[in-house]
Structure formats: structure tokens, C-alpha cells
Amino acid sequence: LTVRPGEKLTGYYIEKTSGGLLLHVKRKPQSKDQSLPLKGLSIMLDPGHGGTETGAIGPLGLRYAEKDINLNLAKKLAAELEALGARVYLTREDDRTVSLEDRLAMSKMMLPDLFVSLHANSMADNVDISKVDGFSVWYREPLAKDLVELLYNHVTGSLGRTLKGTHVRNFYVTRGTWTPSILLETGFVPNPQEFEWLTDEAEQTRLAKSIAEAITAYFRE
């Protein structure tokens, strides 16, 4: 799909019908409610891992693994987005195992205006854990690039996070073309300093607010 310069398309998908193939193209939605800038928009949050899939392990081991960090942040971010008028869906609301296929299928079924997968990073065993930190954003489809750059710059700037960059990668949950689909790596769980920041309730709230601000700015453009 080739998009003309200046067109603000945020999604497309092909539907098979009895008459052939139907191409759906979506333009960026915008709320006209100044007090609720995300009113009428739907956002899907994807807390990474869960259940038997713990994700990265930090200083407290399984007592507070990446899966818990991701879910706590997702709930805080959901509250921030709902306060701005958005309808928010979560791929999981508790500590359960959800396959990558099911996560992407939920996105395809709901067709949200935005899909955000929340993760925290790990690292190799032979790396000095005190020297690896930072925030990064990942995506696959070019239609997510504007959002990625805006969110990355806002979060790292407002919170003073170490820059780990924006990256193109074929992560399964970012394959959706029907909406901007991105994956956040909020920090490195094995790093004790990063772990303390990632698990602190006040810092989680600050991060959630910063992400919500960036999302709001994106839909106002």
C-alpha cells in the first residue's frame, strides 16, 4: 500500500467478501471534545507475558517479575486514558497466560485506534547489569512511525529516561496493519536501579501519565 505524502492514514486491512476483496483504509480519528481529547477513540493495551510466562526476572525473582510490572503499568495507563475519554481494552486483566496469536487476534477483532504492548527488558547473563538501562519503542509498520517518534521523545524528555532508541522489528504483536501497533520496553528488570524505578507506584503513575500525554498529542496532530 502506497500512501501519498500528507495523508494521515492510521490503518488498513483487506476483507474477503462474496464479491472479491475489499480494502479498508482508516484515517486518523480526532475528538472534537476539548475537555475529553480522547473521547470516541478506542485503545488496546497489551500487558506482556502473564501466567506461566514470567518475562524478565529482577532482584526479587518471581515475587515481582516483568509480567507484574507490565500489568500494573497497563492498569494505571488505562485509568489515565479513560479519564481523557478513551475506551480502553486490555488483552489480559489478571495473571493469566495469553498467546501472541490471541493478543493479535483481539486487536484484529476490536480494530482499536491504537495498540500498545507494554514490556520491560532483560539482558544477557554476561552483561554488567548496572550499565544497561533505558527506554525504547519498537514497531513494524511505517504507519506507526509518527506515533513512535512522538511518544519516545515525550517520555524520555519528560521523565529523563536513558535513550535506547526507536527500532523496527517484526514482533508478532506489532504486525497489525489495521491500527498503529507499537511495543514499549520501559526499562531493564535485572538492573537494580531500573527495577526500583519500574516497581515504584509513584513512578509507574508518572510513566503512565507521560505515555497518555504523548498519545493525546498524537491524536491532536
Predicted regions mapped to residue ranges:
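Active-site-adjacent mobile loop/cap segments within catalytic or ligand-binding domains
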Residues: S117, S122-D125, S136-W138, H167-E221
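Soluble non-cytosolic domains of exported or imported proteins
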Residues: Y64-N72, D94-E101, E141-D146, L198-K209
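Active-site histidine-acidic residue metal-binding/catalytic motifs
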Residues: H24-M106, M110-L114, A124-V127, K131-D133
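Solvent-exposed loop/turn segments at secondary-structure junctions
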Residues: H49-T52, R63-Y64, E93-V98, A120-D125, ...
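A short, gly/pro- and small-residue-rich
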Residues: I129-D146
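Surface-exposed edge beta-strands and adjoining flexible/disordered loops or tails in beta-rich
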Residues: T2-L36
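Sec-exported extracytoplasmic/periplasmic mature domains
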Residues: K75-A86, K108-P112, L143, Y152-G160, ...
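Buried hydrophobic packing residues in well-ordered domains
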Residues: L1-V3, L45, N70, S107, ...
